[in-house]
Curated annotation (Swiss-Prot):
This is Photosystem II reaction center protein M. GO terms for cellular component: photosystem II; plasma membrane-derived thylakoid membrane. Belongs to the PsbM family. It is a single-pass membrane protein. One of its GO terms (biological process) is photosynthesis, light reaction. Keywords: Membrane, Photosynthesis, Photosystem II, Reaction center, Thylakoid, Transmembrane, Transmembrane helix. Residues 31-52 are annotated as: Disordered. It is found in: Cellular thylakoid membrane. Its main location: membrane.
Amino acid sequence: METTSFGFAASLLFVGVPTIFLIGLFVSTSDGEKSSFYSDTSKGRLSPEPKK
């Protein structure tokens, strides 16, 4: 019983952690692209010289 529960937890961690990491990475990347795009176009905070 202990071995199977450990194996279940290990497989759950092995599958769940990369999935959550990939989802979080995808969300943060898309959100970062959006925010950087908006801040770059409206305020130009990312670039030292404003492009106009």
